[in-house]
Amino acid sequence: MLMVVSPAKSLDFESPLPSGLPATRPPMLDESARLADILRQMAPQDIAGLMQVSDKIAALNVARFAEWHADYSAPQARQAVFAFNGDVYEGLDAASMDRAGLDWLQPRLNILSGLYGLLRPLDLMLPYRLEMGTRLANPRGKDLYAFWGERITTELNARLQQDGSQVLVNLASDEYFRSVKPAQLAATVWTPVFRDSKAGGPYKIVSFWAKRARGLMVRWMAEQRIESPDDLRAFDVEGYRFNPAASNGTTLVFLRDH
């Protein structure tokens, strides 16, 4: 059973890493290099408009892409699950996981990425910013969905075959999961949904909490060695509970009261 999650805009290339941490190379670096070549030719103001960011952030990313190269190693790169630092990754908290948990996640967790396509937890990455929804014109079309085409789905199918699995747990955002083509995926997609209620109000998807909950579920799956989607219903971390009435088929709804 495989999982997909989104990356994060926030990065951490400063915190100490666990000692003896292994590192692997992303499988689609040739594709990443093609994107970096396109971005390297863009002026700071063009990057700012494309990514809808400030001049300061645009300048930072111009410098990043100017220095980006496919032949990189650990001194300048960092394992993906430790490099991303958003809400999902705070919930996952890889830094406090034991080596056995990381080893379990390595062939199962897939981080969708605008630049790298797919990253495993211990794949080395350089700092970057390139959201999947970016309308970056390229030889294959008008945006990154056109650029990646079926490539991400093909790679996921290869990993599903290697894992001997026919289940993909979707813990990614809609923006990122659009890069996967479910009709061509050799798996059934299961989608956990997290809703919170404050002071007895209606249950709603609250972005911060939902993202954190996705990371919590990834960590819980690693700790419990979850291999069946049916077992996902037992997830009960930080007050979430499975709600059968709100769920439907392969959409599993978890509710929490505040």
Swiss-Prot record:
Gene Ontology cellular component terms for the protein in this record: cytosol
Alphabetical list of Pfam families matching this protein: H2O2_YaaD
Coiled-coil positions: none
Organism: Laribacter hongkongensis (strain HLHK9)
PANTHER family: PEROXIDE STRESS RESISTANCE PROTEIN YAAA, PEROXIDE STRESS RESPONSE PROTEIN YAAA
Family, as annotated: Belongs to the UPF0246 family.
GO biological process: response to hydroperoxide
Protein name (database record): UPF0246 protein LHK_02295
Annotated InterPro entries: YaaA (IPR005583)
